[in-house]
Amino acid sequence: MKKVLLPLAALVLSATASNAMAANGTVKFTGEIKQSTCQVTSDTQNKEVYLGTYPTSAFPTVGSKSASKAFQISLEKCDAGDYSLRFDGNTVAGNPDLLSVSNVGGTGAAATGVGIEITDNNGKPFAIGDGSNINDDVAKVTIAADGKATFNLQARYRSFDSNVTAGLANATSPFTIEYK
């Protein structure tokens, strides 16, 4: 009986001994929080884009669009890397890619049934607000060796209701440049 217990005891002790010899280590996390030197050029920092005057008949159905008006936001003195653009502002309920229009800056009633859509040069729309762009590639530029880059953009009216009413159709949209 002692011959059976002795090997069994040795087996149990060897199994527990390997657990007692566990190794310890350390994980080192490194990184840097950096103040970006990137600047929006003075001529594109506070832009006014005139979208034009259109009759209500130019928006006969939901999704009708006006002509697009081109504009740019240019960056300078940037570190190398990818930068993204985020627009903020009040949006049309159920349409996260449309800025709500109002009569801000004017007198009279605001138009209804339309919003302002901001797109890239290919017509891909930006989501307004939370940074989750409908088309993520829309919002990125890579800084050139000279520290400069330009977002080429367009804006237009787009109807979200089949009953568009006349009035002022103005909106403002603060924007943020983010280092990615």
Swiss-Prot record:
Secretion signal span: 1-22
Gene3D superfamilies: Fimbrial-type adhesion domain
Main location: other
Alphabetically ordered keywords of this record: Disulfide bond, Fimbrium, Signal
Function: Fimbriae (also called pili), polar filaments radiating from the surface of the bacterium to a length of 0.5-1.5 micrometers and numbering 100-300 per cell, enable bacteria to colonize the epithelium of specific host organs.
PANTHER family according to UniProt: FIMBRIAL SUBUNIT ELFA (PTHR33420:SF3), FIMBRIAL SUBUNIT ELFA-RELATED (PTHR33420)
Protein name: Type-1 fimbrial protein subunit
This protein's encoding gene: fimA
